[in-house]
Amino acid sequence: MDMNNPTPHHNLHFISQCFIKPHTIPEESKQPYYLSPWDLLMLSVQYIQKGLIYSKPPAALNDDGQFIEDLLRKLKHSLSIALVHFYPLAGRFATISYVDEGSCLVYVDCNNSPGAKFIHARLDMTISDILSPTDVPVIVQRLFDHDRATNHDGHSTSLLSIQITELLDGVFIGCSINHSLVDGSSYWNFFNMWSEIFQAEDDNFSISRPPVLQRWFPDAHGPILKLPFTNLDQFITKFEAPQLRERMFHFSPASLAVLKARANTEYKTNKISSFQSLSALVWRSITRARGLSPDQTTGCRLAINNRTRLNPPLPENYFGNSIQAIRTAATVKELLENNLGWAAWKLHEAVVNHDNEKVRDHVNKWVESPFVYRMEKLFDPLSVMMGSSPRFNKYGNVFGMGKALALRSGYAHKFDGKVSCYPGSEGGGSIVLELCLRPEFMSVLEADEEFMNATTPRDPLHYY
């Protein structure tokens, strides 16, 4: 799939768009909403774009549009209620420049904004057209708003955009949220709470996991954190993905148990997790597929939640970014000549060693010398990045159409070696990997016996 050429467009029709404001205006929303170091780090990367695909109820297939009309009305109303709790998502970024200091302050203005964006579109394709192909069709990118936008664009574009795309036999709910406001935990908590409100049909419903909007800042710093920039070109860049293929690979609970047992047996331990074993398999397999020289250094990075690693810990529902990418590395020769257990143990060590001291040290260094992440530097053609998490509640979001059939993502954060980890739709501990590679590397991976034998063959009657 050529990530830079999202064609053909098929017949995607944009029917309408509007902006949704909070149903009632919280008093706190009248104050500036300041960004933490973890939030500011994300200004030059892209929005989080995830979406769920649902089957239309049988009665909706020939009802002259009444079902979708009712669905849109309920989605808009429940979204307005959700935004009372998650009011920063209805705001816009604002910047104060301190030219004499050579610095600027970026924050969220929750007051002077039209609200969150809501789009209704129609696509003349079926669920099978989207989910059956071996590779994820490029049309999926167009099921999300804010395509290729950076988070800094949130000064002029909505921080949250919902695109509802009606298919011939289904509905795709695409949600784009500014990554300088949320990480994966906050993103899915918003999605989950919106679903709760939709199902409750009660404006006064008490959500089960209200977001904790109080900001976290390192000791003796904040809430005002200035960036040492005055011009956009000093810290904001656009990233264009190379030509890629994108595939979904399914791993059953039984297959993951075998991988875990193998890794622990090989390293003579019982501490390696299923996910660490799977990540080691992916790292080794992609490294083989790339045909790298034995003396080259390859790395594997894991996105890790800092909430529970701080002391004292942050609340589980802390709203905002609280993540880091931890990395382990080896020469290609070391990685491939040693076994799966050796690679999995290196990942295990990186995880267990990421503690309160490491987290605070990283943040304190940022305070001393602020910077932002740049996509082109996050992209390492010799390494693998494991993002998202199979622990997030991605299939508990019900919007009057039953359980979602599958999850797909947009253009954002795709590069060679990027892997996003999702729970399998059937549950039970299964995992689906969304894996992006250059076409020539994907072809080799598809012929890799160790990797493919660990996957579950595609079932034409079951999507993932």
Region roles according to the model:
Residues 1-25, 45-46, 77, 457-464:
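Terminal membrane/secretory targeting segments in land-plant proteins
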Residues 2, 125-134, 449-464:
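A signal for specific C-terminal beta-sheet/loop modules enriched in small/flexible residues
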Residues 379-461:
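Low-complexity, glycine/alanine/valine/leucine- and proline-rich hydrophobic stretches
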Residues 15-17, 25-31, 44-45, 49-88, ...:
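Soluble acyl-CoA-dependent acyltransferase catalytic core bearing the H(X)4D motif
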